[in-house]
Design a protein with these regions (language model features):
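Short, low-complexity disordered leader/linker segments with a strong preference
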Residues: 1-40, 62, 421-427
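Short, solvent-exposed loop/beta-turn-alpha elements that line the ligand-binding surface or hinge
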Residues: 115-127, 168, 185-188, 193, ...
Length: 427
């Protein structure tokens, strides 16, 4: 398997889009498959830090020795923009990883993906979590291979040192109080935060929508208010790193948790594979556990949010049939077993796959961590709609303004509604 960075395909995209570069200059030669093999290209992000890709590609190559998979590696933060640019330029990468349903909706509505109903029909649809998110008027343009949802990571040693119990069945008020209690100064004089909220809007908006049955495309966002107030209060009290610093310094949530700078952290299940690998490589010794996401009220069902990750076939794929075969394998039981072994939650959930997951070395096995894996409801992070991408852009912009204090919560929520209604919904 050879890995290609985006630079290795930049010449072709440049020719199509007129990007910066000298006309007629020779770009890097694309790696070729070994003689007699098909070279299948797959777009990915942060290949070295996202172990599921290597696991899937190695597994597929072992099962299909006449195929060489070449990852097209893109920086995680640049991924949506770069894939959009590639597609607009007629790039022929075979398989495109759909990082979220927002991007999927845009690519599908733009006619940039191939319909793969023939692949989906071969899958165990009843047990394939997240599949409905890719249904566009009865047509599927991608199939999910993993299904992530959000829960609460916590540092067991930091909680023990503070003399507090593990964070079971927390309400948001209890979570905020606990975060403040856990905030302290480390031996090196640096702050140890009670929690860490990453800069993504979903940390506030998606969980608010999930727990209030809110519609993020509807244009009325009063249900965001309590969640923003909680987040800003934590920031003001110093119980979490302030948003402006995290944004400007491009703070890594992994670094915050793995170096003991944060005692708790709401984050998706995708991080499990990353932290297991970091511990295996000796990059962290954090003693970690999992808990359900905090809830509005205690004693009720656990509601969280999540999003499937999927593979799609580029409309201009160089090897369409092989791309479809790869997706069928990755979204099926063999692909699910492969990623389960490294701590990734697969979209396919049956007894064989689940058993394989919970035998994983290093996965917390305490009752609270196991409970975190069985939320009662997992809402979709963002509705699938042709309006999702435009709405997401507005919500992101206004989210940033609220979090850095340039708008009050009330004014920010009002502005979100006005802009979505006028710019997206045409009201």
């Amino acid at each position: 398997m050879k890995r290609t960075t985006l630079a290795a395909i930049a010449l072709a995209v440049t020719a199509g889009l007129g990007m910066t570069g000298c006309a007629g200059a020779a770009g890097p030669a694309e790696p070729q498959a070994q003689e007699g093999k098909t070279r299948l290209t797959v777009s990915v992000w942060n290949y070295e830090g996202t172990p599921e890709f290597k696991a899937l590609f190695d597994g597929y190559e072992a099962a299909n020795p006449k195929v060489d998979i070449e990852p097209v590696d893109i920086l995680a933060d640049d991924y949506p923009q770069k894939v959009t640019t590639m597609l607009a330029g007629g790039d022929t990468t075979d398989v495109l990883t759909m990082k979220n349903v927002i991007d999927y909706s845009r690519y599908a509505s733009n006619g940039q993906l191939q319909e793969i109903n023939s692949v989906v029909d071969t899958l165990d649809k009843d047990n394939l979590a997240g599949l409905d998110a890719f249904n566009v008027d009865g047509k599927y343009f991608a199939a999910p291979y993993r299904q992530d949802f959000w829960l609460l990571y916590y540092n067991k040693d930091l909680l023990k040192a503070a003399g507090v119990e593990d964070p079971a069945d927390l309400t948001w008020d209890e979570y905020a109080a606990l975060a403040k209690k856990l905030t302290t100064t480390g031996a090196d004089g640096k702050a140890v935060y009670g929690t860490y909220h990453h800069v993504w809007r979903s940390v506030i908006q998606a969980i608010a929508a999930a727990q209030n049955d809110g519609d993020q495309i509807g244009g009325d966002y009063g249900f965001f208010e309590d969640q923003y107030n909680t987040a800003l209060d934590l920031q003001k009290s110093g119980a979490t790193l302030d948003f402006g610093t995290a944004k400007s310094q491009k703070t890594s949530y992994r670094t915050m948790f793995e170096t003991g700078q944060a005692a708790m952290m709401p984050m998706g299940t995708w991080y499990i594979a990353g932290i297991l690998q970091a511990k295996k490589d000796g990059k962290t010794n954090v003693n970690w556990g999992l808990a359900p996401m905090p809830q509005k009220k205690s004693g009720g069902d656990v509601t969280t949010f999540g999003s499937p990750t999927a593979f799609a076939v580029n409309k201009n794929a160089a090897h369409s049939e092989e791309a479809k075969k790869f997706i069928e394998w990755a979204a099926g039981e063999e692909g699910a077993k492969v990623i389960s072994k490294i701590g990734v939650v697969p979209a396919l959930q049956n007894d064989a796959v689940t058993d394989a997951y919970f035998t994983l070395d290093g996965l917390p096995t305490d009752d609270l961590s196991k409970k975190a894996f069985t939320p009662d409801k997992t809402a979709l992070e963002m509705p699938v709609s042709d309006k999702s991408a435009a709405t997401d852009k507005i919500l992101n912009q206004e989210h940033d303004l609220i979090m850095v204090g340039e708008r009050s919560v009330a004014d920010g929520i009002t502005e979100m509604g006005k802009r979505v209604k006028s710019e997206v919904l045409g009201k």
